[in-house]
Amino acid sequence: MGKRFFFILILAFPLISWGQTKTNWETLAGVQYSYIQNYEQNFWYGKPTFSDKVKALENQEIIIQGFIIPGDISGNSYYLSAFPFSSCFFCGGAGQESIMELRLKNPKKKLKLDQVVTLKGTLRLNDHELELNYILEEAVVQKD
């Protein structure tokens, strides 16, 4: 009985992580930009063209690690960055592909500036100017 259970457990182990793709920022860097002017609001923005590798991640559950950047004072909005605050897209000149908007499954969870976290969620690609290129929906902080 014990050997059979152990054998079944070994066979089932790969299924536990099935459906999730561990992703890194290097993969998400697979994007090119065409700069377009928004005449109504008078600003330029980078319209992304995603690589096939990035497109394959759309609407997939991914796992990614990065640095937390709070989006507002109330602590209800967060971003995940490939770099700490001093080097992030908004502050230090990194590219648009190095940050993603987080839509937390539990928005009451408080996260700190530059906290290193691993998150799991569904990746949505966005090519509209008013949101970031990458949005992680139903994001959950993983236990390290």
For the regions a protein language model found, what residue spans apply to each?
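Sec-dependent N-terminal signal peptides
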Residues: 4-14
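OB-fold and OB-like single-stranded nucleic-acid-recognition modules
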Residues: 19-144
